[in-house]
Amino acid sequence: LKGSTLKLVPENCHHILIVLKGDVRFATDGNEYVFHERVVFVPGPDQTVAVEALSNVQILEIRWFKREGEDDQLAAEYKTQFPLIQIYRNSKQYRDRNKSDKTISRSCIDQRRIPRFALGSVESYGVDAVKSHDHPMLDQFFFSFEENEMDVLIDYEAVPMGANELLYIPLGSIH
């Protein structure tokens, strides 16, 4: 609700905050960031973040728990700078051979920014289809924005998916 504040303290995880709707202010590490649109915001895992709703806001939080040694990997190999911020409309767009020409795929958090994690989106309009495919070494979660309604085929079984739903695609499943 407008005026609400949430404080997230450092844990053994990354707080991946996806603003779905509304206006929000993030305060972390002595800086403030204000957004009025869809955005992904990931504070440093060792930083406290205050989240203030400037309007009625909807945020999806993913807590991605760290494994031993990943802090060293972040510093040495990934060189990720926090907070990690990706405005949705500015996310890198790409084409996928399994998807139609009217489908827009976006990379919201590229791989090798947070160990074992990447975040993308698929956007289309009207009737559309994606060819069945699998990811033999990848678990996936699908989140449907509020303007979406679809059926997702998982291992050839239709699963209805409506607005603001999170769906788990098990490791190696055909979808």
Residue ranges with predicted function:
Residues 113-122, 130-175:
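Compact recognition or signaling/catalytic modules
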Residues 8-37, 138-163:
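A short beta-strand-loop-beta hairpin characteristic of the jelly-roll/cupin
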Residues 54-74:
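A short hydrophobic beta-strand segment most commonly corresponding to one strand
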Residues 35-53, 64, 161-175:
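Conserved metal-binding segment of the jelly-roll/cupin
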Residues 1-7, 97-139:
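A short glycine-rich, His/Asp/Glu-containing loop-to-beta-strand
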